[in-house]
Amino acid sequence: MLMPKKVKYRKQMKGRMSGTPQRGVSLAFGEFGLQATECGWLDSRQIEAARIAMNRYIKRGGKIWIRIFPDKPLTAKPAETRMGKGKGSPDSWVCVIKPGRILYEMEGVTEEIAREAFRLAAHKLPIPTKFTSRKDAHEG
């Protein structure tokens, strides 16, 4: 699972997901990409599940880049615990996603294979996504 090696503060506030991302909205490495169309939180397990789904489909054909990293800790209290007594301990890590953020990139495969691999990956994610390519970016 993806998680930071070391953080300054163990626990964070929930925060807000409004607005657009400051960076990470254009393709930087590959030819094709999977772009988020709405905001949400992606868990480290969901990021890994989508990566495995893509790798299984393209086999050894191309290269995949993960453009996101879960750096926000989620806390949880133990089961059957009464309310109060402070905030729970860090449980998992999430990545805050805003609309337009590139989640994954891919190259070394045809567009049809990339589309299908990203479709399989999108089924593992809790947010709606769309396929994007360098060709689309230059035309629009």
Curated annotation (Swiss-Prot):
InterPro entries, alphabetized: Ribosomal_uL16, Ribosomal_uL16_bact-type, Ribosomal_uL16_CS, Ribosomal_uL16_dom, Ribosomal_uL16_sf
One BP annotation, GO: translation
Domain of life, per lineage: Bacteria
GO MF entry, a single one: structural constituent of ribosome
Function comment: Binds 23S rRNA and is also seen to make contacts with the A and possibly P site tRNAs.
Oligomer status and interactors: Part of the 50S ribosomal subunit.
The protein's name in its UniProt record: Large ribosomal subunit protein uL16
Organism (species): Geotalea uraniireducens (strain Rf4) (Geobacter uraniireducens)
Upper lineage: Bacteria, Pseudomonadati, Thermodesulfobacteriota, Desulfuromonadia, Geobacterales
